[in-house]
A protein has these predicted regions:
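Hydrophobic anchor at the beta1->P-loop junction of P-loop NTPases
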Residues: 5
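P-loop (Walker A) phosphate-binding loop of NTP-binding proteins
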Residues: 8
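Conserved substrate/cofactor phosphate-moiety recognition/catalytic segment
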Residues: 22-60
Length: 167
C-alpha cells in the first residue's frame, strides 16, 4: 500500500510521515532535498532553474514510485509525484518562471511516467496557514528557503486547495 502525505512547504509532512511510520511500523519514504543539486540555485534565480529543478524532482519521485511499487510494505511518502506537476510546475508556469517549451517537455515526461505507475492508494492532505508555514520554515533554518516569499506560499496554498478539491 502506498500512502502519500501532501501539503505546502513547512506544513509538517516529514513530521507526520515519521510519526505514522513509527506508530504503525510502516516504511517511510522521504523527499530528498539534501542531495538536490538545483535547490539552492532555484531559490536564488527561480526563472533560470525551474525546469532543471522540477525535472530533477520528477526523476527522483518517479524512482520513488517505482521502488514503492516493488515493495510489499506499507509505504508512507512525504510529497508525491503528483504535487510536482499539479502544484509546483503549475505555479511556476503561471508565474512566468517556465517557458511553454519547457512546460510541454516536462508534461510529456510526466504523462509517460504516469502511464507506467499508479497514484497513491491513499492521500493525506496537510493544510496550514501561510503565517504557520513561514514560522515552520524559519524554525528549520534551511538557508535556501529564506528567500521564499509569502506570495509564493499563498499561491501554493491556493493550488493545493484546488487540486485536493478535484482529486
Amino acid at each position: 500500500m502506498h500512502i502519500g502525505i501532501a501539503g505546502n512547504i513547512g506544513c509538517g509532512k516529514t513530521t507526520l510521515t515519521k510519526m505514522l511510520a513509527k506508530h504503525y511500523g510502516w516504511t517511510p519514504k522521504f523527499e530528498s532535498v539534501a542531495h538536490n543539486p538545483y535547490l539552492e540555485d532555484y531559490y536564488k534565480d527561480i526563472e533560470r532553474w525551474t525546469y532543471n529543478l522540477e525535472t530533477y524532482f520528477l526523476a527522483q519521485r518517479f524512482q520513488d514510485v517505482l521502488d514503492i511499487a516493488k515493495s510489499d510494505d506499507v509505504i508512507i511518502q512525504d510529497r508525491t509525484i503528483l504535487e510536482g506537476v499539479h502544484i509546483f510546475v503549475a505555479n511556476n508556469k503561471a508565474m512566468g518562471n517556465m517557458s511553454d517549451r519547457d512546460y510541454e517537455t516536462y508534461m510529456h515526461l510526466f504523462r509517460l511516467m504516469m502511464s507506467m505507475v499508479k497514484k497513491p492508494d491513499m492521500l493525506i492532505y496537510l493544510k496550514s496557514s501561510v503565517p504557520h508555514l513561514v514560522s515552520q520554515i524559519q524554525k528549520r533554518g534551511r538557508d535556501y528557503e529564506k528567500s521564499i516569499s509569502i506570495e509564493y506560499l499563498n499561491n501554493l496554498n491556493e493550488r493545493y486547495d484546488k487540486w485536493i478539491e478535484e482529486y
